[in-house]
UniProtKB/Swiss-Prot annotation:
Belongs to the GcvH family. It holds the Pfam family GCV_H. GO terms for biological process: glycine decarboxylation via glycine cleavage system. InterPro entries: 2-oxoA_DH_lipoyl-BS (IPR003016), Biotin_lipoyl (IPR000089), GCV_H (IPR002930), GCV_H/Fam206 (IPR033753), GCV_H_sub (IPR017453), Single_hybrid_motif (IPR011053). GO terms for cellular component: cytosol; glycine cleavage complex. Its cofactor is (R)-lipoate. Binds 1 lipoyl cofactor covalently. This is Glycine cleavage system H protein.
Length: 125
């Protein structure tokens, strides 16, 4: 598995990329492989204050539904509206099709997340 090294990862299979003062969040290639063809991405509440690990949204496939979690404490500031009409964008390119953006309460919280090698160990473990 070749993972982008310009971002962090969670044990629940989200990727997190810093862009200015917000974190862009999506699901990993491994997660979308496990889920299969996505049919719905949503239930993301822009403006919601979340703690790390709280449910930020949901992805549904023909096989299963899975929650997406906030990687850090923060406020959801954007949802990728393109995914409402085309959830399969994640299947096509999991590492470019972001789901939501979160403004962290403390940007240093990202230091608690996994780097690419750490995530690879979890995903393959």
């Amino acid at each position: 598995m070749s993972l982008p090294t310009d971002r962090k990862y969670t044990t629940s299979h989200e990727w997190v990329k810093a862009e200015g003062d917000v974190f862009v969040v999506g699901i990993t290639e491994n997660a979308q492989d496990q889920l299969g063809d996505l049919v719905f991405v949503g239930d993301v509440s822009v403006g919601a204050n979340l703690k790390a690990g709280e449910t930020a949204g949901v992805v549904e496939s023909v096989k299963a539904a899975s929650d997406i979690y906030a990687p850090v404490d923060g406020v959801i500031v954007a949802f990728n509206d393109e995914l409402e009409a085309n959830p399969n964008l994640i299947n096509e390119s999991a590492f470019t099709a972001w789901i939501f953006k979160i403004k962290p309460l403390n940007a240093a919280d990202a230091d608690k997340l996994l780097d690419a090698a750490g995530y690879e160990a979890v995903a393959n473990g």
